[in-house]
From Swiss-Prot:
The keyword Transcription does not apply. This is Bifunctional purine biosynthesis protein PurH. Residues 1-148 form the MGS-like domain. NCBIfam families: PRK00881.1 (NF002049), purH (TIGR00355).
Amino acid sequence: MQQRRPVRRALLSVSDKAGIVEFAQALSARGVELLSTGGTARLLAEKGLPVTEVSDYTGFPEMMDGRVKTLHPKVHGGILGRRGQDDAIMEEHQIQPIDMVVVNLYPFAQTVAREGCSLEDAVENIDIGGPTMVRSAAKNHRDVAIVVKSSDYDAIIKEMDANEGSLTLATRFNLAIKAFEHTAAYDSMIANYFGSMVPAYHGESKEAAGRFPRTLNLNFIKKQDMRYGENSHQQAAFYIEENVKEASVATATQVQGKALSYNNIADTDAALECVKEFAEPACVIVKHANPCGVAVSNSILDAYDRAYKTDPTSAFGGIIAFNRELDAETAQAIISRQFVEVIIAPSASEEALKITAAKQNVRVLICGQWGERAPGLDFKRVNGGLLVQDRDLGMVGAEELRVVTKRQPTEQELRDALFCWKVAKFVKSNAIVYAKNNMTIGIGAGQMSRVYSAKIAGIKAADEGLEVKGSSMASDAFFPFRDGIDAAAAAGVTCVIQPGGSIRDDEVIAAADEHGIAMLFTDMRHFRH
């Protein structure tokens, strides 16, 4: 049974007024009586709509600079009253039923994000009446529709037209879920903000607590269910932040191909975040969350060709990311050369999409162009807890490097060193990257000892016939012993970039001098676990 409820009276009180006039006009045209408050009521009246101020309806004025508007029994009784059960008491107290509540809340997140926002500003943007009405209407969803998203306005009008001015219980229940999600996210923002202000508020410090409040409330929205998780016996889903600020795998649109898997999304994220490091046309190929080939060039076609040459075996079934539009020539090169799981780029030409369409299973994602990298938080789940840290947005330029050896790097060695340092940031620790002429030639990832990562990078280069002599090597952390330098020298590396900071730095530098290697210290580590 659909359990339809007619909408005869609606209360509208919104901070975000996008679409509210048109929605109110549609409701009024269908015979719905409009109640409203403050700025919303003034806007509707200015547009010629018949609207009753809540203060006139309740007989009680707004007061305390608008802090008290809707907190009245005639409002909440009208919302919470159970049809067929509370009718007598509603009639006794002259409480009219309110069939629809349209509310979105004070812009707390936007307020506290503004530079110079004071605690007092934040406090005044904590909505009280709004969440109370939202929760009341959601609780009584059997009789009342609660609308918190302007994106639902059109669908609601269409359903009312299809049901003689009524909404079904299924729709009201779905709207109630959205309402509880809305208030939960709102309260989470407030709790996080105040949690970060605890020391300052109690006089323990002149500074706020910082990025990490004493309780962390997170709000993510399910974007899609996965066929399964990392393995076929695990269930999984993909959740995204409500307001993603940066082009990412979360914002990407899939324009062709099979449904994305859990591993596809994880690997695509790794590839895209790596390719964002480069200003020049770049290509990153990822397999099992590790780059297996990276290159920059004057075109993405050449960048792809050079990235593929690093490790064609591992590139099979990989994820390919670009930082420029996917063009037809590059799309043809990929489709003709290899099996690929996912291609992601800021955009793709129509000709390129016609070419990839020939391989229907290939997933093509368009993420949009990104600007400056947005600061944020990284999370790592542990059993019973959550590790939280800032995103690793650390970068170094040539002017920040310290040459610690007798020999200075050549211009090409320096360029290659900076290039492979960017790549090493996205390779699982212990990470070693060999690079020459703006392309990776060997990558050693995830080994328990750094020397073995160095050896693997050399083996990879040798297997593909790539010349290591004259190359640069990046290490994501310091060398605890000289053996990693000896291994690199044996392979032909002539320049090393690493953080430094080992108690045996002197021995490591001496080893580099013995081999005639130029060594650069970044004073910044890039562990990745």
